[in-house]
Amino acid sequence: AVCVSLLGAANIPPHPFNLINFMKMIRYTIPCEKTWGEYVDYGCYCGVGGSGRPIDALDRCCYVHDNCYGDAEKKHKCNPKMQSYSYKLTKRTTSAMVPQVLVHVLSVIVTARQPSASAILNTSSGTRILTPRDIADDI
């Protein structure tokens, strides 16, 4: 339930990077008791880099997250951590205008964070609701 806590740097000042914006969206939508600092050097994959076999479910989530961003970089020749998008936070829900290239990345992270959750993303081709099934279909 804390899979995106490595992004949960609530005490980091705002930056124009999508990774920071996405962290804010997740923290607002699904408040968490842990902070980014508690996971920055956890297991084999939470934090910068990663290798070996994940040590537990949380570390496995970080592994999935790392691979998801890596796949987006390879397949779409982009840097999903830096790609900007706009979002609006209201009443613990998130509405975002997300480039299509990031839909897969966001679905993996949102679903990893809260497996029963769904995310509504507004893409250039229309509104898309992402559920855990999207991960099975996209991976």
From Swiss-Prot:
Protein name: Basic phospholipase A2 beta-bungarotoxin A2 chain
GO cellular component: extracellular region
Signal peptide residue numbers: 1-9
Cofactor: binding comment: Binds 1 Ca(2+) ion.
Record localization: Secreted
Organism taxonomic ancestry: Eukaryota, Metazoa, Chordata, Craniata, Vertebrata
One of the record's GO molecular function terms: toxin activity
Tissue: Expressed by the venom gland.
